Design a protein with these regions (language model features):
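Active-site helix/loop of acyl-thioester processing domains in fatty-acid/polyketide metabolism
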Residues: 43, 74-100
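Non-catalytic linker/capping segments at the edges of enzyme domains
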Residues: 2-73, 102-104, 120, 138-140, ...
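Short alpha-helical scaffold segments that flank and stabilize functional sites
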Residues: 56, 87-90, 132
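C-terminal domain-closing interface element
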Residues: 125-152
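Hydrophobic beta-strand-centered segment that forms part of the acyl-chain substrate-binding groove
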Residues: 15, 19-21, 88-128, 153-155
Length: 165
């Protein structure tokens, strides 16, 4: 059975309102990452309870050259980073709005991720994050990553703090 967040993802995946497009564009512009360490292509939906976004692991990404060189797969640390960027940082930017500045500091405080399937070169993944709590500048979320077949690749809990100056 799909959770309410997954149902919302599948509905919103096919329809994105103009206000959502503007909101997600602003969030993406505020992300403190750039290529080659940006793992967010698009935000499908975002509200005060969670966020859904996508990223495609292009075949030319540098880490594939050495991570199981004869059968490259995406490293778990990169999958975790992708879930943190979409599921934690994008949601945090949405929640604090314009309080985030270039001087703001981001810190991952804890992760507990279970890896279930590999992610191969060229695969597009979807990250779905549900807020557990946001208090005292700490955001904790339940996150899951789905492959293009809607199979769960990995899932768990991620928490972090963004210090707003």
């Amino acid at each position: 059975m799909l959770s309410p967040r997954l149902k919302y993802y599948f509905f919103s995946h096919f329809h994105k309102s103009e206000s959502t497009k503007v909101k997600t564009k602003e969030i993406l512009e505020k992300l403190p990452y750039s290529t080659p360490f940006l793992f967010v292509d698009d935000l499908v939906s975002v509200d005060e309870n969670g966020v859904t976004g996508t990223f495609t692991f292009e075949e030319d990404l540098d880490f594939y050259k050495g991570h199981f060189k004869n059968n490259p797969i995406t490293p778990g640390v990169i999958l975790t980073e992708t879930m943190a960027q979409i599921g934690l940082v994008c949601l945090r930017i949405f929640l604090v709005g314009n309080d985030l500045t270039e001087e703001s500091q981001i810190g991952l405080t804890s992760t507990n991720i279970e890896f279930l399937k590999p992610v191969y070169l060229g695969e597009k993944v979807t990250v779905i994050s549900e807020k557990i709590y946001f208090r005292f500048n700490k955001l904790k979320c339940k996150v899951k990553m789905l492959n293009e077949k809607s199979e769960i690749v990995c899932e768990g809990i991620i928490a972090g703090i963004i210090k707003v100056n």
